[in-house]
Structure formats: structure tokens, C-alpha cells
């Protein structure tokens, strides 16, 4: 364990889809400084998304230096670095030169759809579900790796000879920070590759063979909270470096940042869409409702399991009101207009603009508004749009609770939309469960910092961290069971009528 008596800070590196950030935190988990750099989004053709790994590295290393400078501290005062990252995004690089052989293929990229269809034709769906907890989809890293090896001449043979390395973004950053000494990932990121057996905690031989991916190129998989190596800062040597001591994929880091480390604890990140995770403890629960089974962080960063569900349209629904319908000038205005009316006047808005995600999984569903009468005003539509976010969250959480056999104790929330008090209260009313909004908004970074701090003894354990997980406001349910059932029944009827709309197109 690292000696941290004279070290008063932890740095979290938050490498996201559109920007790289560095956050300095003190012993009380207060944010001391934040530095952020956006980087280029590359769209070679429709449905393809790439990043330049060297630009990711340049922006991330720059934010680290800037955040320390802003805080007015020296790197020798930092006890550890924790890393959280966009998941699934795939980097393959030359072991000798440290240069990527191709741009990073981003999690959003759909170029490997044909490879996924091949896997389905080869009857691998059940094997993927059973071993990895995932579904066959271009979203995950496995088919992205195969695509690069298929399209960069000689790369597969070089990978077999140990000349090329694969990593998700965490692996790439650690390789660069340790000057090529360390090639690792953690269990949460490995679990999103569609190559990792989440039960045996090892790379799956059958999937590697099916995709012709050489095992030699894969990183060592470690826990989410331990010292992996040391970041060499400003040309210094390894002995002078900062311990890199925490890794978690962004959603799992947020779950840990919320201190959702016990079975039945869950969080929802309200962004463009929503990401819901519920801790299921030592039990890997197989979903009967289209949810993913994934690895989360246990109380000390060890392996725990979680159910994960994604909602496609949440904040994007409010953006639609603003940009296309011109009903509001600013997303923040939605709360004001929603509270000008007592209810939605019987209106339900189903925001299936790109189909419906969990638990319906209907790509042919389309957006619809139901219950329109002459008495419906713009305010009612705005309210119905906000309510749709809460209804969709309830659908996923109901599925999670049925799958896990666990009743949600409280829902921890983060993301841009949580500042909307109306939405948070309506969410609590629909769930019949308290909704807890944290005081610290940097929950994902907090999770990475906690993992690094635990590994180095900077923080003593969960009890100390729980004292720091301050809740700014608890939204208690204030709705009768009869009213809740009536609202939910109307929503379910609306969803049913929006389904399979585009099936014949």
C-alpha cells in the first residue's frame, strides 16, 4: 500500500466520448479543480464513428497537467490516479512504436454489423449471452477488433507474433502513462468487450476462435482497485510517478461513486438517453427482460455483478421540444412550463424516435402522442415529454427488480436532467421509491477517485466514503398507489400502440 500521509489529493481522469477531463479531489472528496478538452469526432461514412487515439492521449495528458496547475499543486502531492472511460471503444497499437494502426473505433460505430450477423448465423447468440452477459451487437469491442484485423493488411499475423496490442481506452491511457510498461484493463471494461467470460473471469476461447482474434494482443485483466503501475509525469522516471490505482468503465464508476455497492442499490444517469445499473452482488443475474448482465465494483473494487438497461431517448426528447417544435427556448425552461399545469391532461408522449430500448426492444416502434383533445396546451405536451423520461425509467427498473428478485431501496441519480425538480419528484412518485440527488455532480469521476483512494489507503474504507457521499436532496414519493397504477396503465397502453409502427416500411 502506498504511503499517503503527505499526499492530500486524488486525480480522476474521465475520458469521455466527446472530451477528456481531469478532476482533482481532496481528502473530503471536494472538487478542487477541473480541466477539460474536447477532441475531434470523425465520421468516415454514415453510421461510422472514429477517434484519433493520439488526440485522446494528448487531450487527456494535457488536462492532467492543467488540473494540477489550477489546483496549485505538485504531482508529488497526489496519492493516486483513478481512470474512468467511455466503454467498448477499441484501440489497436504497435507495441514497439506505441502508434495506433487505425483510428479508435467508437462504441457508437455500426460498421461491424455484418460480422454480428455472421455470429448469429453461426448460432453463437446463446453462448454470448451465457458467457459474456451481453447480446451480439456492434456496440461491443469484439467485432470492432475483428474489423480492424480484417482490414489492416498483415495486422492479424503481427498480433499473433505479439507485435500489436488491443485495449479499451483505459488500457491505451495506462500504456501511454507508464511509457509502455503496463498493458492492463479492469473487469468492468473487459466485461464490455463481448470476449470476456464474466463467470470464469477470463477471455473466452470459443469467441476468440470464432472471431480469429489472437489472445496475445489482449490485456491482462485486473480488479478495479489496485496499483497497476506509475504515471511518469513531465519526463520523470517511474519511481517519481503517481500510482495508477483505479479503473472502471463510466457507468460502473458512476454506480460506485453513488456508493451503490450492495445488492438492490441502483442508479440512473439522465443524459441524452438514460443508463440504469442495479447492483446484484455476488450473483450474476440473467435477465428475462432484455437487460444486460455486467460486472460492477464490489465494496473494495472487487468483482460484483449488475443488471444494466439503456433508454434511447431522455434528454433528447426535451431537445426535440426545443429544436424541432420550438416550444421552449432552453431545456431548463421545461420545468417552469411543466409546473404551470396540474397534470398532462391525459396526454402521453412516447419518444420512440429511434425505436424502443429495454425492456421492449422494438426497433420498429415510433414516437407518438396519445390523448390529444382541444383542451391540450403546449404546457401539457412539455409536461408529457418530461413524464416520458420517468415512465421509461420505471419500465427498466421494474424489469430489473423482477429479474433480481430485489426491491430497489432508493434510486441515486446523476446527469444533466437531475436539476429538474419536477422530473425528480414525478420519478419518485411513479416508482414509489425515494430518489436521492447527490451534492457532488461529478459522480463518475468520484467513483474512479474512490477506487484509487481505497487501493492506496488514502481513504480507509467504505464507512469513510459513505460519510462523504452527501445527498443534496431526497425526493420522497407523494402519490397514492391508486394514482400510480392509473398513470402507469395509461403509459403502457400508449407504448403498446406505438409498437411495430414501422414494421412494413
From Swiss-Prot:
Residues bound to ADP: 17, 21, 272, 315, 416, 420
Regulation: Inhibited by fructose 1,6-bisphosphate (FBP).
Catalysed reactions, as listed in the record: glycerol + ATP = sn-glycerol 3-phosphate + ADP + H(+)
Residues annotated as binding ATP: 17-19, 272, 315, 319, 416
Cellular component, GO, one term: cytosol
Pathway this chain belongs to: Polyol metabolism; glycerol degradation via glycerol kinase pathway; sn-glycerol 3-phosphate from glycerol: step 1/1
Keywords on record: ATP-binding, Glycerol metabolism, Kinase, Nucleotide-binding, Transferase
EC numbers for this chain: 2.7.1.30
Stored CDD domains: ASKHA_NBD_FGGY_GK
GO biological process entries: glycerol catabolic process; glycerol metabolic process; glycerol-3-phosphate metabolic process
Family matches, as InterPro entries: ATPase_NBD (IPR043129), Carb_kinase_FGGY (IPR000577), Carb_kinase_FGGY_CS (IPR018483), FGGY_C (IPR018485), FGGY_N (IPR018484), Glycerol_kin (IPR005999)
Residues that hold glycerol according to the record: 87-88, 139, 250-251
Residues where sn-glycerol 3-phosphate binds: 17, 87-88, 139, 250
GO MF annotation terms: ATP binding; glycerol kinase activity
Enzyme type, top EC level: transferase
Protein family: Belongs to the FGGY kinase family.
Function recorded in the entry: Key enzyme in the regulation of glycerol uptake and metabolism. Catalyzes the phosphorylation of glycerol to yield sn-glycerol 3-phosphate.
Record protein name field: Glycerol kinase
Species, as recorded: Azotobacter vinelandii (strain DJ / ATCC BAA-1303)
